[in-house]
Amino acid sequence: MGRARMRWISRTLPAIAVAAIATVGTVAPASATPDAGELGAQWTATADGPATYPGMDIAWDVPIRMSDGVILKANVYRPADADGRPVDTPFPTIVSMTPYTKLVSALAEAAVSAPGISDAVMDFARDINFSGTPLSGITDLTRALSGGGLRTFTVDRELIRSGYTQVVVDVRGTGFSQGIWQVFQEREQQDTIETIEWAAQQAWSNGRIGMSGVSYSAINQIQAASKRPAALQAIVPIEPGGDLVRDVVAPGGGAGVGFLPFWLAAVNGLKLIPDVQALMQGNLDQTWLRDRIADPATFFQYLIQAITIPDVDSIPPELQTLLEPDSSLRLAWLPHAEQITAPTLLYGGWHDIFTNSQPRLYNAIPLAPGKKQLVMGDTYHLNPGSGFGDPGYPPRLDVLQRAWFDRWLKDIDNGIETYGPVTSYQQGNGWTTTDRFPRAGVEHRRMYLAAQPSGTTATSVHDGSLLASPPSGTTTLTVAPGLSSLCSRDAAQELAGLLAVIDGCAKDNRIAERDALTFTSAPVAAPTQISGPVNVHLNTVLDTTDGYWTATLDDVAPDGTSTVLTSGQLTSSLRGIDEGRSERSANGDLTDPFYTLTLAARQPIVPGRPTTLDVGLTATDALLQPGHRLRVSVAASNFPKGMLLRPLLNESRLAPQHLVLDPASPSFVNVPLDVPIP
């Protein structure tokens, strides 16, 4: 049946397979330089060299019974001989847990491996070049196709033919697996551990387990590794999240309405696709069918409630679980990276939907640098590893993954542990290698928001200055919620990179700044590094009991182009912070506020009364070139990345908001710089 199904897919779905290749990105590797020098060339030669085994065998829909009786379905990919028979030798085994269905993985694998087709598509993608045009973002996305990320999303046939087994499993409640989709909760996490243990005990496994996968399949790697199953010896999470509420569900306390509806629709839609072969044979799994009927639209109720409940008193207990930090749901979503002992190669992007967590995860893992690696690209969620494998870039992501597994699952001394350990695309500069993040030598410094014009923009609500010392005199500036943020880097980030094809939105913030107050520094005279988290401290006044603030940190070029380096947002009434988890600089200023984000700690605003709050911006890594300026923009909305929960939106009345610039209670940005900006 396995080979028959393989023939069915290869004969009837080539068009879908080719389409799948266009929807996934890529990522890459590491050493003492970003391209890893001679070692990188060796890793690439190994990955692209002759296969140890000529074929690949697939066992379809293998049942794995969980401890509570629910049956998960897995495809098992094994090395095969020239006749297609699986090789009897036990191999290290790679486990991938996916909610996007192993059928999608199989189609993507067919696209990557189809003779003639995949090479043609990759060559076509390399030839697409919109650089220097207003649509250069198209090239940024298409260059991901040749970077190796697709093979980390799906099944890497070449990895298997080199002597690995891969197990791709539909997580509970998705694909052909029974049960109710748990969205990372404890039962789903237990399933991952039990699947790892099951794989380690099979005759085709030598008991040494690794994990691979992108996004959802990266998050469950972090969760599994934190539980330290004995068999799990290496992970390669590509674009993982950590604290999902703060990352994407409710950044700054506002609903992430740009990403969540489409993502939930995709997973819930895919999970309803039945096993067509079983259906045609009259033996469709009735338990699977009952489970899908019982819960066809998992988690949509939270989103609907968040945007429809009219007032705080009407919030139902179900939604309150998302708003209480000690709820079982919120606790299950915390990463506990500090408990990881398996060697970890982590890829993230400075504009990924999970950027907030990626450097935090790396720093929290208690392993020596080298045994843990961080690669951060100038990328969105859809294009991990864009350009990898090109001169000056890290090696392709599949190359890096192969080297990582060879080192930690096969004990091959290939030098991968000498890479990095932090390989970062420094915005405004390019690919760099450093020994830590944030970089050594930076210091958080105040720069004050001042009303005096900088003369650098005529399109923002107010053109102010960014100064090294407090301004004289008190000024109140007003900014109203608007929709110009629909064309912004934050919108591109929230939409996983789809909007990044338009440079005027993703690479220049001046359209979004039409609804913002801007504060711009003098030009820097020497290269100036920015590395780490950023905090914007605001002295605010509202006419209502709630509001929403967003801030960006921008690199302003001599021609006026304003490129967002990082951003953050905050619901005014949810400004309370957890001091034990927040970070401050030596003078007591917050550098990285950690919000409690709970209804119990909500602090409604007293209209007309000045209220200070801190807008934390995600960590960044950048270099201001001589002649460039630093800018902070402040706005009263950030749709679609974040929107006030409906009860709080009603309280805000979408009224204009006021920023007070008062030397006695100044507004300022606390930014990590290696040298002061005058």
Segments predicted by a language model, with ranges:
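Catalytic-loop region of hydrolases
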Residues: A32-M122, F153-V155, T459-C505, P676-P678
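Conserved alpha/beta-hydrolase
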Residues: I160-F176
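Alpha/beta-hydrolase fold nucleophile elbow
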Residues: A203-S215
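Short beta-strand/loop motif that positions the catalytic acidic residue
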Residues: I340, L346-G348
